[in-house]
Amino acid sequence: MKLSHLDEKNHPKMVDVSDKNITLRIATASGIIYMSQEAFDVIKNNTAKKGPVLQTAIVAAIMGVKKTSEIIPMCHPLMLSKVETNIVEFVKECAFKLIVTVKCEGKTGVEMEALSGVSIGLLTIYDMIKAIDKSMRITDIVLESKEGGKSGKFVRS
């Protein structure tokens, strides 16, 4: 399989999307951070010394989405239409799941933006709580779904 971001000499290049049609692009990604009961309670009770952890993680996730083309070398800068975040608590597991959905009308997909948003949001939670629990585990960062473009629709089963 020939990779589109390599030229005929196997040198990296940014894919030329100028001939692609502008279509609605939507992608959703998610990831989970597991932690100790103490760390979970500090977040839930909003008593972290660094401030409101989940609210800060949401803002960080949005910033991560917007900065994707600056930190992932072959990503195109995109005019985003919407970034939506959701955090689900798993009380029994002392975990939070961050879900990020990104939307735009463009010539290339927003999968990397959604994945970057999840990654940055979860890393922000880690950063804000690491004084309490350095053993936190970030896991299962995945693309949940995407639609638009030539490859069509994908939904994780």
Swiss-Prot record:
Belongs to the MoaC family. Keywords: Lyase, Molybdenum cofactor biosynthesis. Substrate binds at M74, C75, H76, M112, E113. The keyword Lyase applies. Homohexamer; trimer of dimers. Its EC number is 4.6.1.17. This is Cyclic pyranopterin monophosphate synthase. The active site is at D127. Pathway: Cofactor biosynthesis; molybdopterin biosynthesis. It is an enzyme of class 4 (lyase). It catalyses: (8S)-3',8-cyclo-7,8-dihydroguanosine 5'-triphosphate = cyclic pyranopterin phosphate + diphosphate. It comes from Campylobacter jejuni subsp. jejuni serotype O:2 (strain ATCC 700819 / NCTC 11168). Catalyzes the conversion of (8S)-3',8-cyclo-7,8-dihydroguanosine 5'-triphosphate to cyclic pyranopterin monophosphate (cPMP). GO terms for molecular function: cyclic pyranopterin monophosphate synthase activity; GTP 3',8'-cyclase activity. One of its GO terms (biological process) is Mo-molybdopterin cofactor biosynthetic process.
